[in-house]
Amino acid sequence: MKASELRNYTDEELRNLLEEKKRQLMELRFQLAMGQLKNTSLIKLTKRDIARIKTILRERELGIRR
């Protein structure tokens, strides 16, 4: 998901999406441990999405506009 797309979301929607991505990451890690995960790059992509969401939320807290 692109940062420009995420900037259109409200803070509440971003927080909900953040929780969803964290749950998804946990499930992916379980699948990896069980040997069921075939596409391991999904872990990397999910972690990057989490970082993007956290960055946008922090920018809004500090009043930084992009």
UniProtKB/Swiss-Prot annotation:
Gene3D superfamilies given for it? 1.10.287.310
Any idea which GO molecular function terms this record carries? structural constituent of ribosome
Q: Which GO terms describe its biological process?
A: translation
**Alphabetical list of Pfam families matching this protein:** Ribosomal_L29
Query: What SUPFAM superfamilies does the record tag this protein with?
Result: Ribosomal protein L29 (L29p)
Q: Which GO terms describe its cellular component?
A: cytosolic large ribosomal subunit
Q: List keywords of the entry alphabetically.
A: Ribonucleoprotein, Ribosomal protein
Q: Report the record's disulfide bonds.
A: none
User: Which InterPro entries does this entry report, sorted A to Z?
Assistant: Ribosomal_protein_uL29 (IPR050063), Ribosomal_uL29 (IPR001854), Ribosomal_uL29_CS (IPR018254), Ribosomal_uL29_sf (IPR036049)
PANTHER family reported for this sequence? 60S RIBOSOMAL PROTEIN L35/50S RIBOSOMAL PROTEIN L29, LARGE RIBOSOMAL SUBUNIT PROTEIN UL29C
**Which family does the similarity line name?**
Belongs to the universal ribosomal protein uL29 family.
Instruction: Report the protein name in the record.
Output: Large ribosomal subunit protein uL29
Protein encoded by which gene: rpmC
